[in-house]
Amino acid sequence: MAPNLRKSHPLLKMVNNSLIDLPTPSNISAWWNFGSLLGICLMTQILTGLLLAMHYTADTTLAFSSVAHTCRNVQYGWLIRNLHANGASFFFICIYLHIGRGFYYGSYLYKETWNTGIILLLTLMATAFVGYVLPWGQMSFWGATVITNLFSAIPYIGQTLVEWAWGGFSVDNPTLTRFFALHFLLPFAIAGLTLIHLTFLHESGSNNPLGIVSNCDKIPFHPYFTLKDILGFTLMFLPLTSLALFSPNLLGDPENFTPANPLVTPPHIKPEWYFLFAYAILRSIPNKLGGVLALAASVLVLFLSPFLHKAKQRTMTFRPLSQLLFWILVTNLFILTWVGSQPVEHPFIIIGQLASVTYFTILLILFPAIGALENKMLNF
């Protein structure tokens, strides 16, 4: 009998073991769809980004008008740009839901997979930040100025570091050029990291909603989960295309329709919605270095999750107190996102400070404490 090429060819064998014959727990829910959705987001962003880069000019005098030219004169340029800008929002929606799933179901106990995932999140945040600067509108320019300026809070080397990053004494042409280079490069780094992420995942196999070993009950990935993933793609592309076609500027900032002007500061400088929770934490501390450290900690705290897991059960499926705490954390993140979009005045200052303290308290103190308490209550 002739050997099955899919199982014997060195390259096809890898694809087969990752996407076709991969043993998958039979009970994984729709929350396990977000990994593949993130993959399709990345592919969409790279494709639309490549098409946009063909018409973009990374120069302060031409950047704004080159984006306008793409939208006005290039065939379907407006659609490509709208899909790319809103695709970033969907990328972040998917990654936040993906992290939330991992947190709820204790997937962080696969330490290598979890840690590479956080590195992926940080790379994605960096990519989105440098990308936001490229249209060279008012919010692009001032966002770049404010965020890069945060590095000056680093003792001793801060100011030198910022001027080195800028390529001068302010955000200017060299900054835009290097940001474009970085924005082109980083998605490919994300693609590489994704392969590492998947390699670590396939070492252990997927977790499942019950958090128990599922080796006795696994089914092939294809056709069951390929079909389920395609349904997921459809359900994501529908709202994405609707947003890009009907209200493409809903999530953007009106300030970005004004070309960058170093002499006029916008009344409220704020990042895109997906960074607002971290921005609120940054603003809630009146000290510059303290704010920067809190900003970094807001994401880096995720690295501690595996070490703060004190419960004897892996998932929160059968732990009602932890579930309650989890949903309080989610609500708290929504409050932080809302506060980050508001001006720095009473009562938003105090709400932001309380929400920031609550965020770290829940993650660092309450989750381990409640986990230990539940062990006692369940006589573990």
From Swiss-Prot:
Residues reported to bind heme b b562: 84, 183
Molecular function per GO: metal ion binding; ubiquinol-cytochrome-c reductase activity
Keywords: Electron transport, Heme, Iron, Membrane, Metal-binding, Mitochondrion, Mitochondrion inner membrane, Respiratory chain, Transmembrane, Transmembrane helix, Transport, Ubiquinone
Keyword Electron transport part of the UniProt annotation: yes
Record InterPro entries: Cyt_b/b6_C, Cyt_b/b6_C_sf, Cyt_b/b6_N, Cytb/b6-like_sf, Cytochrome_b, Cytochrome_b_C_euk/bac, Cytochrome_b_N_euk/bac, Di-haem_cyt_TM
Cofactor(s) named in the record: heme b
Cofactor remark from the record: Binds 2 heme b groups non-covalently.
Pfam family, one: Cytochrom_B_C
CDD domains: cytochrome_b_C, Cytochrome_b_N
Residues that coordinate or bind a ubiquinone: 202
Subcellular location as annotated: Mitochondrion inner membrane
Membrane topology qualifier: Multi-pass membrane protein
UniProt xrefs under SUPFAM superfamilies: a domain/subunit of cytochrome bc1 complex (Ubiquinol-cytochrome c reductase), Transmembrane di-heme cytochromes
Main location per the UniProt record: mitochondrion
Binding site for heme b b566: 98, 197
GO annotation terms (biological process): mitochondrial electron transport, ubiquinol to cytochrome c
GO CC annotation: mitochondrial inner membrane; respiratory chain complex III
Transmembrane residue ranges: 34-54, 78-99, 114-134, 179-199, 227-247, 289-309, 321-341, 348-368
Other noteworthy facts: Heme 1 (or BL or b562) is low-potential and absorbs at about 562 nm, and heme 2 (or BH or b566) is high-potential and absorbs at about 566 nm.
Described purpose of this protein according to its UniProt entry: Component of the ubiquinol-cytochrome c reductase complex (complex III or cytochrome b-c1 complex) that is part of the mitochondrial respiratory chain. The b-c1 complex mediates electron transfer from ubiquinol to cytochrome c. Contributes to the generation of a proton gradient across the mitochondrial membrane that is then used for ATP synthesis.
Protein family per UniProt: Belongs to the cytochrome b family.
Quaternary structure and interacting proteins, as annotated: The cytochrome bc1 complex contains 11 subunits: 3 respiratory subunits (MT-CYB, CYC1 and UQCRFS1), 2 core proteins (UQCRC1 and UQCRC2) and 6 low-molecular weight proteins (UQCRH/QCR6, UQCRB/QCR7, UQCRQ/QCR8, UQCR10/QCR9, UQCR11/QCR10 and a cleavage product of UQCRFS1). This cytochrome bc1 complex then forms a dimer.
Protein name, UniProt field: Cytochrome b
Organism field: Thalassoica antarctica (Antarctic petrel)
Lineage: Eukaryota, Metazoa, Chordata, Craniata, Vertebrata
Gene that encodes the chain: MT-CYB
